[in-house]
Each structure stands twice: as C-alpha cells, then as structure tokens.
Amino acid sequence: MPVEPAEGEHPMLELRNLSVGADNEGVHRDILKNVNLRVDDGRLLVLTGPNGGGKSTLAKTIAGILRPDTGRILLDGEDITERGITERARMGIGFAFQQPVRFKGLTVRDVLTLAAGGQVSEDKLYDYLRDVGLCARDYVDREIGSSLSGGEIKRIEIATVIARGARLTIFDE
C-alpha cells in the first residue's frame, strides 16, 4: 500500500489528469488519456508496456519535450506544465533518449564536463565512467563518434546524466 505524503508535503513528481494526443491526417488520436501518477522522492519507477503504448510520449511530456493537451505536471508541488525543457532541466529533470546523440568532435571528457556545468576533477570524471561500467582510462579522452558502439554511447549518456546531478532522471529505453 503506497504511503501518502504528510500534510503540507508533496510528492516529487505528480501528474494530474494528463492527456496527450497527436493529429494524423486531420484525425486527433489520444496517446495518453487522464494519466494520474505520484512519485515520491528517492523512489525508482519503471513503466513497461507494448510498443506504441505511450511510454516515450509520457517520458517526453514530463521532460518538457512535448506539451500535454490537458492536465498538470507538478514538481515538488509546483506546477511546471507550461515550462519548457530548458527550464525543467534547470529545475533538476534529466532525460536520456532512446537513441543517444553522438557528439562528433567532442571527447567523453568534454561532454561530461559540459553535463557537470563546469570544471570537473579527473577523479570525478573517472567516477562517472566507473559508475556506468566503463574503464575510465580507456574512454575519458576518446572522441564520441562512429568508433563507439551503441552500448558504449548509451553508457556515456548515462554518465552525463549522473554528472548533471539531476533530481529526477527519465530514461526512455
């Protein structure tokens, strides 16, 4: 049985009657309809379902990539429904895409430093890579490009999410 927050406390994330749809050839189709969800701080939530079930749409809507048709998104009790992806990222919402972006010309060190928001010690860079199962010595100065496998790129993307220090991280797998 879920524990409700005490009076005056809010769940970290709350969705209230969230609906998202898409227009296709003049026909509106509901993808998500009246979704209600509460996620308390420090919890892990995994959503599973069939292809086309709306998982990516939900993830992108929470992150601010998509806008809901109706409903509200609250972070720590504050309505963030109208805020964009950049502002939500500043508020601590991180997002990892299904297909990680390849940053041609940048090294792993570069993207981790950017994600962390400034200079990062060598030890911290190594920690981020070790946390995702990569040998830091072998990867920290490698260029992110076609020489890395999809799995390596995904691990590096997860390391950037860790470096970002996001409060709420959404992985669209």
Place the predicted regions along the sequence by residue:
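ABC ATPase NBD coupling module
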Residues: D79-G94
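Helix-to-loop junction immediately C-terminal to a conserved catalytic motif
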Residues: A63
